[in-house]
A protein has these predicted regions:
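Active-site and donor-binding regions of nucleotide-sugar-utilizing enzymes
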Residues: 7-157, 303-304
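Short His-Asn-centered micro-motif
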Residues: 10-15, 38-41, 101-105, 122-123, ...
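Active-site regions of enzymes building and remodeling cell-envelope glycoconjugates
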Residues: 32-36, 47-63, 115-120, 134-143, ...
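Short, flexible/disordered intra-domain loops and linkers
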Residues: 63-78, 229-237, 326-329
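A nucleotide-sugar donor-handling region in carbohydrate enzymes
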Residues: 136-218
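Conserved donor-binding/catalytic core segment of Leloir-type glycosyltransferases
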Residues: 214-230
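Catalytic donor nucleotide-activated moiety binding site of glycosyltransferases and closely related
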Residues: 249-278
Length: 342
């Protein structure tokens, strides 16, 4: 790790999307020599290895409640000793989950969790907004806020410490009032980057020519979601749901493009379909020139940034009661075809 005096920026990333955004926003010197990265389990370890100044937080969801509590308290107590630069460095972060304890009560700038994430999650009627309001009024919520600060409960920038939002498109939400909002469309970020910078970003994601050839081999892409990893569906439920969707298409024309956090074994369950499971978000592939004639998805927000001349078959979270309870009902803010299971 670099001398702490050289660390002027902190980037807390829970998704490949937010990491991509940070890489566009800063130059290579800042990224390589003056940023310490904290990666959550949503980041692939092989990608994380490409960053010299980095700390990786493993998935804690399968640990006992006591073990998770011990880890949280340990991080709360030791963070400024282990990472003294947290006291002074500018913080750019996704503020959900366990790593948000690193922010504490410091000001920070929010990175995007994905396209339109604030519009989707931080408006009246959204599952997350309702959960935050309910939790804040409980004794447990008040204790958590006292120990860790408000951010652990009021994430997605819904707190007084989040001063800036870095978005890739215009979002709408009452929590944006009074905040500094930067809107940097991905295509503009890509176009404004030099060829060397574009190659640099692709190299961080371990993308090579043979990967591009695989992706270009099929005209239709199924965009997966990490619903088993998020413990929303069982393996059997995931298989049955995806099988019911894919039977509507010619399997020889499809490639399954997995979500970066999706570890479901599509090769095992769908042996006749090409699978691309490198942990790369579709938005970056689109910027690099990968184009499909059609995308199929349940409710992946990855399709929000896809060019309008690409067809979207959108099934929606309402095709499964567990997914609907988690995601809520929403639709793309672009042309799409609403699909139904037969």
């Amino acid at each position: 790790m670099k001398n702490d005096l050289q660390i002027t920026h902190v980037s807390i990333n829970l998704s490949m999307y937010a990491l991509m955004q940070y890489l566009f926003l800063f130059d290579e010197d800042t990224i390589e020599n003056h940023t310490h990265f904290f990666f959550g389990p949503g980041l692939n370890k092989e990608v994380c290895k490409n960053f010299r100044n980095a700390t990786y937080f493993p998935n804690t969801s399968k640990l006992s409640p006591l073990r998770r509590l011990t880890l949280k308290l340990g991080l709360r107590i030791t963070k400024n000793w282990k990472y003294p630069f947290l006291k002074t460095a500018k913080i750019y972060a996704q503020d959900q989950e366990y790593p948000s304890i690193l922010i504490g009560r410091r000001d920070y700038s929010l990175l995007s969790d994905g396209p339109n994430c604030i519009t989707i999650h931080m408006n009246d009627g959204s599952t997350i907004m309702a959960l935050q309001r309910a939790t804040n009024n409980t004794l447990k919520g008040k204790v958590v806020s006292l120990i860790y600060g408000d951010i652990l409960l009021n994430y997605y920038g819904n707190n007084k410490y989040c001063k800036e939002f870095f978005m890739t498109e215009v979002n709408s939400s009452p929590i944006l009032e009074g905040k500094i909002v930067h809107v940097n469309p991905l295509q503009e970020l890509w176009n404004n980057s030099s060829t060397d910078k574009q190659r640099y970003i692709l190299s961080k994601y371990n993308l090579y020519d043979e990967d591009m050839d695989t992706l270009r081999s099929k005209p239709i892409a199924y965009m997966s979601q990490p619903d088993v990893d998020n413990r929303l569906l069982s393996t059997e439920e995931q298989y049955n749901l995806v099988a019911a969707i894919l039977k509507n298409y010619d399997s020889s024309q499809i490639i399954i493009k997995t979500h970066p956090r999706d570890t479901f074994d599509y090769r095992k369950y769908f042996p006749g379909i090409t699978v691309f499971d490198k942990p790369v978000n579709m938005e970056l592939l689109a910027l690099a020139g990968i184009k499909f004639s059609k995308f199929i998805t349940i409710c992946s927000t990855s399709v929000f940034g896809i060019p309008y001349d690409t067809e979207i078959d959108w099934y929606g979270a309402e095709i499964n009661s567990k997914l609907l309870a988690h995601y809520g009902e929403f639709n793309p803010n672009r042309p799409y075809t609403k699909m139904h299971l037969k």
